[in-house]
Every structure is written in C-alpha cells, then in structure tokens.
A protein has these predicted regions:
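Short, Lys/Arg-enriched, Trp-marked, Pro/Gly-tolerant hinge/linker segments that flank
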Residues: 127-138, 151-208, 212-219, 232-244
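Ligand-binding loop in jelly-roll beta-barrel domains
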Residues: 78-103, 109-112
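Generic protein-terminus/edge-of-domain signal
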Residues: 1-72, 78-79, 89, 112-115, ...
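Helix-turn-helix DNA-binding motif, specifically the short coil turn and the N-cap/start of the second
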Residues: 222
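Short, Lys/Arg-enriched alpha-helical recognition elements, typified by the DNA-recognition helix
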Residues: 142-149
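Short hydrophobic/aromatic patch on the recognition helix
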Residues: 70, 225-230, 234
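Aromatic/histidine-rich interaction motifs
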Residues: 111-142
Length: 249
C-alpha cells in the first residue's frame, strides 16, 4: 500500500491506496531509516499504530500523547492528527495498519456497518486512544496489533479471513471506547468540519496573499471564531499555519 495527499483537502487529506481494492486493509511498514515529522492530515480509514522502537508524539486537535516502544494507538476515521519524532528520528519503528469500514462490515450500509462501524466513525468525541504497554490490561489488545502485523507480513492462504476475525475482536474494545465518549461528539464534529474547510482553502490558495477574513469565510465563521478554532484545534494561528504550510511545500 502507499499513501498520497490529495488536492481536495488542501494537501491535508491523505488517500490510502491498497494493493487490492477487494481488501480495504493495508500495513504501512517503513522499516529502518529516518522517520520524518508528519504534519497535520486526516484520512477516512481507521488506523492502528504500534511502535517497536523509538518514541513519537501524536497530536490531535484536542489531545497529545507520547508513545514509546511497545505502545499502540487507535486513530478514528476523519481525525486531524500530526506526528512528531521524540529523540532520535532514526530509532523510530512505527507500524501502521489502515482499514476501511468495508474491511470489517463487508459493505457500507449493511447491518454490521450500521450497528458497529458507523457509530465509531461518527463519534467525533473519539479522536484517538493511546494503548500503553505499561498497563497490564492493555496486553491482549497490543498482542492483537502485533498479530495483525505478523499476519499481513506472512500472507498466505486464509490470512485475510484470520486478519478480519482478529480485527473484529479488537473492534469490540474500540466500540466500547466510542460508547464511553457520550454525547459531546456532535458539537466537536461541527468544529472539525469548519477547521478542515479552512485548511482546504489555505491549501488551494497558499501561493497567494491571504487574510484571516478570507480564511474565515471558507468556513462561514467570523475572524474571531477563526482564530479561536485554530488555537483550539491546532494550537497555532491562521497566519502561522499558512506560513508553515508554505515552507512544507
């Protein structure tokens, strides 16, 4: 599998391309080498990450975690997040498993999707969950992540069915996390869509002079609300984000 950014989201939405469109699952296994800083982005797929070396700071709009060797993480569908190496970037070994709702449900809109996958994807209060290896209760879940990586690498007959069965078991835990988040998701969901609209506009016009008022209009909010959202969601100002985006290009 490989990943690429697409223009529709101002170089912020990431498109996951699978080896086969018949299996909406992919393991991103970069191997040894320098691990770069990964700027703000999002993708429709769910993500399970697992570290076998080094340390990474994960940031979402509202949370921040430092993961070390033996830790894992779940990133929900559509969540803005960024990754920053902690310490030596060459020591980092991150293994990310991406999968769409179709992988577990079989097809969008069927009973499995409606009952178990969509409620998690639509729970905007659930951005990411770190799974620390230092907590004994997490051992079974982390072993599931390791087993998923091994199955994907090995391939062979029936690996797709074994992988889907394994992820179905892990999903019971993920579904429980979503239920615990309560009713805060609707308000957060609206803010997420506004910040994505403004990031998309910056991505489309980064080569031009721009004002905060123009950025705010992309999400139909005031200048003040624009500043508030950037501070709350990304920890920066609209101007600072635009300047950083230009440098990355």
């Amino acid at each position: 599998m490989y990943m690429e950014s697409v223009d529709e989201s101002g170089n912020v939405k990431e498109k996951i391309s699978y080896k086969s469109q018949m299996l909406h699952y992919g393991l991103y296994d970069p191997g040894e080498g320098y691990f770069p800083e990964i700027p703000w982005h999002w993708h429709e797929e769910f993500e399970f990450g697992y570290l076998t070396g080094g340390a990474i700071r994960y940031k979402t709009a509202r949370e921040e975690f430092i993961l070390r060797e033996g830790d894992g993480i779940f990133i929900n569908s559509g969540v803005l997040h960024a990754l920053h190496p902690e310490g030596n970037p060459e020591s980092i070994r991150l293994h990310s498993q991406f999968f769409g709702r179709e992988f577990l449900a079989g097809a969008l809109g069927n009973i499995f999707d409606i009952r178990y996958l969509a409620p998690v994807a639509e729970q905007k209060a659930l951005e990411a969950v770190p799974v620390y290896g230092s907590i004994p209760e997490n051992m079974e879940f982390l072993e599931g992540l390791r087993r998923g990586i091994a199955l994907s690498r090995e391939g062979g007959p029936f690996f797709e069915m074994r992988l889907r069965s394994l992820f179905s078991q892990l999903w019971e835990t993920v579904y429980g996390w979503a239920r615990e988040k309560g009713e805060a998701g609707a308000r957060r969901g609206a803010e997420d869509e506004r910040i994505k609209a403004m990031l998309a506009w910056i991505g489309e016009h980064y080569g031009e002079k721009m004002t905060v008022e123009e950025i705010a209009r992309a999400a139909h909010v005031s200048r003040r609300e624009c500043h508030r959202l950037f501070r709350k969601e990304l920890g920066t100002t609209p101007a600072e984000y635009a300047a950083s985006f230009r440098l990355q290009r």
